[in-house]
Amino acid sequence: MLVAAALLVAMPLRADDLQDIEKLYRAGDVQQALRKADEAIAAQPRAAQIRFLKGVMLSDLKRNAEAIEVFTALTQDFPELPDPYNNLAVVYAADGQLPNALTALQTALRNDPKHRAARENLGDVHLALAVQAWTAALVGSKGDDAALQRKLKLAREIQTHPG
């Protein structure tokens, strides 16, 4: 039994597995892609690319809690990789967990200071945190709020039309 388990772990990831899963996913058969991903992960638990793709698929399906589990496990198994932290942050942000998103992005950028997507996402998270702070400042405000209102309007415009 131990020998079989050792051989299973030593088996290389088949490129076909990843390609098949990606093809199913792109064709819109996400449920079948997830089943194939689970099978491949069961056979090769450290298959980072397939685990990452599974997290992306779960995120796209708005199954945020499951996506967070997948990306968190990847950050634990491969703490040097920036992409799992970046994608974890995206899911946290979508879930409204901005402080967790900020922490994940900071870790991604410690791992790769030039990671473009993490830098962009960090800006988005900072902007969302600013909107939260400015909105809270308006609650119960009795003073001149024109400058604060302008900031909020501009920030929301950027959030609505980022590109």
List PLM regions with ranges.
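Structural marker of alpha-solenoid helical repeat scaffolds
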Residues: A43, D77-F78, N111, G140-G143
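Helix-start (N-cap) detector for alpha-helical repeat units in TPR-like alpha-solenoids
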Residues: A48-Q49, P82-D83, R116, D145-A146
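Terminal, low-structured helical/coil segments at or just beyond the last alpha-helical repeat
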Residues: L127-G163
